[in-house]
UniProtKB/Swiss-Prot annotation:
Copper chaperone for cytochrome c oxidase (COX). Binds two copper ions and deliver them to the Cu(A) site of COX. The lineage of its organism: Eukaryota, Amoebozoa, Evosea, Eumycetozoa, Dictyostelia. It comes from Dictyostelium discoideum. This is Cytochrome c oxidase copper chaperone. It is found in: Mitochondrion intermembrane space. A motif (Cx9C motif 2) lies at residues 42-52. SUPFAM superfamilies: Cysteine alpha-hairpin motif. Keywords: Chaperone, Copper, Disulfide bond, Metal-binding, Mitochondrion. It holds the Pfam family COX17. One of its GO terms (biological process) is mitochondrial cytochrome c oxidase assembly. The gene is cox17. Coiled coil: none annotated.
Amino acid sequence: MSIAETNTTTEVAAPKKKMCCACPETKKVRDECIVANGEEKCAALIELHKVCLRKEGFDV
């Protein structure tokens, strides 16, 4: 492997946490909304949680 290949592979950061442990604040609010109101009424909270997960390095 050349130096150029090594640098390319190290640029991709792996998530530091498991998905189940990432973004506990948005996960809790999202889950409570889904239980109380149903998934279709919580789309905004679901999307906020996905944004948080993406910031943590997950591909969702």
